[in-house]
């Protein structure tokens, strides 16, 4: 039988983590992240819906790429997704969020560094047909007690809504681990950066 590293599937001891007392803990990667009590943690079904909506947007612009992203789900997982407000309570403003996603790199021998992974992600985004802009290159940054590499981007969604995102990436245990923050204003960006700065690795 081939190992999970060969297939790119999730290992048997993989831990999706859980939220207890407003703290997300993950034993597989050995970290925890406090979550502000008034923010809204998405459950598994909600995270699946968010992922499907993202795929749909990409497929509308590039059907072949949408299929590739769907096929990659077997080696990818969304560990955490948290929004500032409940979806149905937001009117006239962007609902900021942060999340943690991982991808098993078992089949990607070319990815040796976080920069390699972010470059691949950037290439896929540029093929998506969505109007992405990348104002800066990849920058090293310390989040909590770990050194990450960050990629910043903006995108125009649903006609005229400009959304900013920052992807903070490390490679750990054969996975790319990405913390992603999404924001509509500078104030939201700073609030999100403050939240994720509280992550602690064992």
Listing of model-derived features with the role each one plays in the protein:
Residues 2-94, 106, 127-142, 146, ...:
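N-terminal targeting sequences that direct proteins away from the cytosol to non-cytosolic compartments
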Residues 166-168:
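Extracellular C-type lectin-like domains
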Residues 151:
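Nucleotide and nucleotide-moiety/phosphate-recognizing core
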Residues 99-116, 120-135:
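Mid-length scaffold segments of soluble, non-membrane domains
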């Amino acid at each position: 039988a081939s190992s999970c590293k060969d297939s790119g599937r999730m290992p048997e001891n993989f831990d999706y983590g859980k939220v207890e007392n407003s703290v997300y803990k993950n034993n597989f990667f050995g970290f925890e992240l406090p979550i502000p009590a008034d923010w809204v943690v998405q459950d598994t079904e909600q995270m699946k819906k968010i992922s499907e909506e993202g795929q749909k947007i990409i497929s509308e612009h590039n059907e072949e790429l949408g299929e590739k992203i769907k096929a990659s789900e077997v080696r990818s997982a969304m560990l955490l997704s948290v929004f500032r407000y409940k979806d149905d309570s937001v009117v006239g403003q962007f609902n900021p969020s942060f999340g943690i996603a991982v991808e098993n790199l078992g089949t990607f021998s070319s990815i040796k560094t976080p920069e390699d992974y972010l470059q691949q992600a950037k290439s896929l985004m540029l093929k998506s047909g969505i109007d992405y802009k990348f104002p800066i290159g990849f920058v090293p940054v310390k989040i909590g007690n770990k050194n990450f590499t960050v990629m910043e981007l903006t995108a125009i969604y649903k006609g005229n809504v400009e959304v900013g995102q920052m992807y903070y990436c490390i490679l750990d245990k054969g996975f790319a681990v990405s913390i992603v923050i999404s924001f509509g204003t500078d104030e939201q960006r700073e609030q999100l950066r403050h939240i994720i700065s509280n992550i602690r690795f064992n």
